[in-house]
From Swiss-Prot:
Name recorded for this polypeptide: Transcription antitermination protein NusB
SUPFAM superfamilies: NusB-like
Annotated source species: Borreliella burgdorferi (strain ATCC 35210 / DSM 4680 / CIP 102532 / B31)
Gene: nusB
Organism taxonomic ancestry: Bacteria, Pseudomonadati, Spirochaetota, Spirochaetia, Spirochaetales
InterPro entries: NusB-like_sf (IPR035926), NusB_fam (IPR011605), NusB_RsmB_TIM44 (IPR006027)
Annotated function: Involved in transcription antitermination. Required for transcription of ribosomal RNA (rRNA) genes. Binds specifically to the boxA antiterminator sequence of the ribosomal RNA (rrn) operons.
Gene Ontology BP terms: DNA-templated transcription termination; transcription antitermination
Record PANTHER family: ANTITERMINATION NUSB DOMAIN-CONTAINING PROTEIN (PTHR11078:SF3), N UTILIZATION SUBSTANCE PROTEIN B-RELATED (PTHR11078)
Keywords carried by this UniProt record: RNA-binding, Transcription, Transcription antitermination, Transcription regulation
Record-level GO cellular component terms: cytosol
Length: 142
């Protein structure tokens, strides 16, 4: 599923960078990575849930990121980091992977190490780990 998360991150980043409406550029059947088996319905579903779910919940996701990253405005964050964070927050908060919350953070870190700046993975780990701790303690926003 790592490849699917990478493609979803790239789509989320692309939508944000191009400031386009998702309907204008989102075509689930036109994935550029030929190595992804888009005939597999569960892969298609996972990909679309990551992208569409992130944007459907963007206001809440951004609010959670703002609450944790007190000294960083979203506008100041690197767009790559922001796309990874948004997808990670969506996965932690809205997807039902109770037994693999740490794996979601690990995936985000791997993506940050490949696509982010030198220290992106540390920043992303800090934000997502803080969110997970808040969720586990019941103090994060609903």
């Amino acid at each position: 599923m790592h490849e699917v998360r990478v493609l979803a991150f790239q789509k989320i980043y692309s939508i944000d960078i191009n400031q386009s409406a998702m309907d204008d550029i989102f075509d689930i059947f036109n994935i550029e990575d030929k190595d992804l088996d888009i005939e597999n319905e569960s892969i298609k579903s996972f990909y679309s849930s990551l992208v569409i779910g992130t944007f459907d919940n963007l206001e809440h996701i951004d609010s959670l990121i703002r609450d944790i990253s007190l000294n960083w405005s979203l506008e100041r964050m690197d767009k790559v980091d922001l796309a990874i964070l948004r997808m990670g927050v969506y996965s932690l908060k809205f997807q039902n992977f109770e037994n693999s919350k740490r794996a979601i953070i690990d995936e985000a870190i791997l993506i940050a190490k490949k696509y982010g700046s030198k220290n992106s993975y540390k920043f992303i780990n800090g934000i997502l780990d803080a969110l997970l701790k808040n969720m586990e303690s019941g103090i994060e926003k609903k």
